[in-house]
Amino acid sequence: APFQSVYTGIAQTVKRAIDIDSIKRIKDLDLSLYPHLSYARDIFLLSLGLRGMSFIDMAYLTYDNLQGGHLTYYRRKTGGRLDIRWEQQMQTIIDKYPKDTKYLLPILTNEADDRQTYKKLSKRINRHLRLVGEMAQLSIPLTLYVARHSWASIAKQKQIPISVISDALGHDSEKTTLIYLSTLDT
């Protein structure tokens, strides 16, 4: 077919998600002897709590984004604005890390930190998450993408409106979101 290679905006690959039980197993792991794994888990859980927020968006979050019990930010990829209620469990994660930059998380130290820094860190976190996933006896490799897919999957199960899921994922249409949800495998 002549249009076989035309990209329609969403790759039709199976997107793997994990259920609430698996998330609980990840949370319950004792990682006190493995700070690097604990950090990777924190990033994963925070992404999950922040509606599957991407690693790059998390990297650029600052204290200015937090106001009146809400986190408000603009997605780097789409410019879409998101407003998420800030929960105690998110604060607990943030409080573990030093406050020596304007950023909420110890990912970037300044604006000049380039894509390479973020890419390298993202790779390392995914490598560590795979180990966390194995320790939690997950049936799939744990990655940052799994947080995004799992949030969407759980939101769908809880019958959260498609429009809300669509906004959170930064999709430009609900049709895109419906296609995305149909590719989720839990």
Regions found by a protein language model. Name each.
Residues P2-S5, L50, Y60-K96:
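Conserved tyrosine-mediated DNA breakage-rejoining catalytic core shared by Y-recombinases
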Residues A17-K24, E87-S139:
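Active-site/catalytic core of tyrosine-dependent DNA strand-transfer enzymes
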Residues L31-Y34, T72-L82, A112-L121, I140-T143:
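Short, contiguous acidic/charged loop-to-helix segments that flank catalytic cores in large enzymes
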Residues D64-T72, L138-I140, I160-I179:
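Short, polar N-cap/turn motifs at the start of nucleic acid-interacting alpha helices
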